[in-house]
Amino acid sequence: MLELIRHLCLLLVTISVLATDESFKQRSEILTNIVRLAHDTYDDLKTAPPSYDKLEPARIQVLLYVSSIDAVNEASMDFTVGILLHLRWTDTRIYHDKAHNLFLQSKLQSLDFDSENIKKVWVPDIFFPNEKKGSFHDIMTQNQMMRLYQGGTILYISRLSMTLSCPMDLINYPFDKQTCHILIMSFGYSDQDLVLDWMNLTTADDLTMNPDGKAIVVDSEVLLPQFEVKSVIPSFCNRRYHQKAGNHSCIQAEFHLARNIGFYIVQMYIPSMLIVMLSWISFWLTVNSVPGRVSLGLLTVLTMTTQSSSVNAALPRVSYTKAIDVWMSTCLVFVFAALLEFAVVNVLSRKESISGFSLKNVFTLPKDTDKEDGPLNMAEMTVPLDGFHEAEAQKKKRFNKRGIVYAIYVDMTARVVFPICFIIFIMSYWLYYVNAE
C-alpha cells in the first residue's frame, strides 16, 4: 500500500512539472510570435519611440524602489544607492491585432520577455545626469525583466547600483541637513518626443506592487550610520543641454537627510570639553609650580590642535567656517588663554616666597606702602648707618609680597571667570546651531 502511494505521488509531481514546462513553452512561443509579427510590421520597433510616427511624445512612467543607501560621503560630495528602476509605457506596435487574439485564446493576462526578446524591442534611453559611476547587476543572471500586459502596456524593471553627485552645504556641520537628488532624464529625445512622469499607482496591480501608492519607496531596512532619511519627494526638473537641442524631460527624487548628532557628541564635543576643563587645573596649582603648569598648558594646547586637525581631515577644504570649526577654535582659544594666564601670573610672582601672608591678603590688596609706612622722617629714623641696607631689603620684600598677592588674585579670578565664560559659550553655541536651518 505504501509503495502504491509513493508511486502515485511521484506521478503527480511529474505531471505537474511537465504541465508547468508546457505552459512556459507555450508562453515563450506566443511572445516570440508577437515580437516577430511586430518586427515584420514595424521596421523601427527597436530604434524609435512608440508614438514617433504620430508626432506625439511617448509617456514613460517611473517608479523607484530604493533598496539601500550605502554611504553619504562629505569629502567627495556624493552618495551611493541601490535601486530597482521601474519604467512603464504603452507600445501599441507590439500589441497588434494578432497579439490581441493570442492573448484572448491563451487567456493570459501578461507575458514575460526573456533576455533575447528584450533586446528586440524599444526601451527608453534613460540616464542619470548626476551619476559618477554605476553598474547593472548580473550575478547568476541579468537582474532585469520586461512584462507585456493586455493593451500593450510594458513594465520594465532593472536593478542598479550608482554613486551620484550630492553638493553639500557644510556651514552647519555637524548640525546640517542635506538634500541629495537622483536625476532621471532621456539622453537622446527632447520633451517633444519623450516625456517622463512619476508613476500614478491606481490599479489593483499597481497597488499590489506598491501598497503605499507612492512613486518612490525606501526599503524599511535602510539605515544610515550618520544620517536619518526624513523624507523622499518626487519632483520635476526640465533641463536644456544646448540651445538647439530643446528641453529634455527630467524628473528627480529628493532625499532629505538629517545628520545624527550622537556620534559627534561622543567623539568630538565631550572630549574637547574635557580638554578645556583639564586646562583649568593649572589655576589650582601653586604659583611656584612652573614645570607642572607649563606642561599642562602645552599638553592641552597640542591636544586641541591635534583633535581639530583630525576632525577636518575627513572633510573637504571649503572656503567658509563650519560649526565644528567655531567650536574647535573657541576651545583652542580657551586652553591657550589658560596658558597665557599662567605667563601673566608667573611675571607677577617670579620672586621668592609668600611666607607671612594669610588668605585675607588675597582678597584685600595691599595699600600704598607710602601710606602704610607714613612719611619717612629722618628725625624719627634712629637706625645706625650700617642698618640702612637692611631697611631697603625689608622695603623690597614688601613689594615682592605685593606682586605675589596680585598673582594669587589673578589665579582665583580665573577659577571663576573661565568656567562661566565657557558655559555661556556652550549655551550660545548649541542654541544657535541646533535651531539653525
PLM feature segments, named:
Residues 1-11:
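Classical eukaryotic N-terminal signal peptides for Sec-dependent ER targeting/secretion
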Residues 295-307, 329-331:
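Small-residue-enriched core segments of transmembrane alpha-helices in multipass membrane transport
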Residues 6, 273-278, 328-343, 412-431:
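Single-pass alpha-helical transmembrane segments
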